[in-house]
Amino acid sequence: MKYYGKCISYISILILTFFIGGCGFMNKENNKEAEIKESFHKTLSMYPIKNLEDLYDKEGYRDEEFEKRDKGTWIINSVMNIQKKGQAMESRGMVLYMNRNTRKTTGHFYTSITTEDKKGRVYNKEKNTLFNLKNNKIEPTKPIVDETLKNEIKNFQFFSQYGNFKNLKDYKNGNVSYNPNVPSYSAEYQLSNEDDNVKQLRKKYDIPTKKAPKLILKGDGDLKGSSIGHKHVELSFVRNKEESIYFSDSVEFNPSEVNNE
């Protein structure tokens, strides 16, 4: 009986240890998820930005990469990527460079076709249409002959102008990934087609699938903030070897010289 009692005690201790360890692991996961949400909240809480030029008067995260007199540059990018089965990847998007020092904004609308040959070599063909932003309106630097393209650019809206993440903290049970060596991090949530952001995307784009997307918050650099790090919001509808349908958006604050324009 004494031996039996000792066995029961040992088993109980093992179960308790496993339970406590499991709770500790879950708490670490939950804490990291909360950190990732908080990191993205600083930017996503600005959505929707009805008037993009309001960003001239809004400062983002600053670190030692900034010169003292540099007010910084906002870089905004939204792009829809669609690759149907057996076809090339087509990407259509727009990027803005909003210089807070000069209060001038330049950018370009871009389309790219990405293909891969039998040897796995990737080829990319891209076209850019340059423009300026004045009074919250896009003004191409040169006349556009193609009326379809002209209207697409004229009516283009960045996701940051209509997206809404006021309930970001309510998203639960995300699939969290964190690599401190890079560092890189991500949090993934399954959305429904009834989600307001998904509805908005479907209104603006011809999305060739009825599948509901996953919301993926991913970034690199210091979680607390970094001007050389990157944060992206992705709504991924389909991602496999045969086809890819996903939307990507980012709003970043960088030193003014870190700029491709």
UniProtKB/Swiss-Prot annotation:
Organism of provenance: Staphylococcus epidermidis (strain ATCC 12228 / FDA PCI 1200)
UniProt superkingdom: Bacteria
Family classification: Belongs to the staphylococcal tandem lipoprotein family.
NCBIfam families in the cross-refs: SA_tandem_lipo (TIGR01742)
Record's bilayer topology term: Lipid-anchor
Residue ranges of coiled coil: none
Keywords for the protein's UniProt record, in alphabetical order: Cell membrane, Lipoprotein, Membrane, Palmitate, Signal
GO CC term (a single one): plasma membrane
Pfam family for this entry, one: DUF576
Keyword Repressor on entry: no
Lipidation feature positions (N-palmitoyl cysteine): C23
Record-given protein name: Uncharacterized lipoprotein SE_0186/SE_0187
Lipid addition sites, S-diacylglycerol cysteine: C23
UniProt KW Cell membrane keyword: yes
Signal peptide span: 1-22
Main localization (coarse): membrane
Annotated InterPro entries: Csa, Csa_sf
Location relative to the cell: Cell membrane
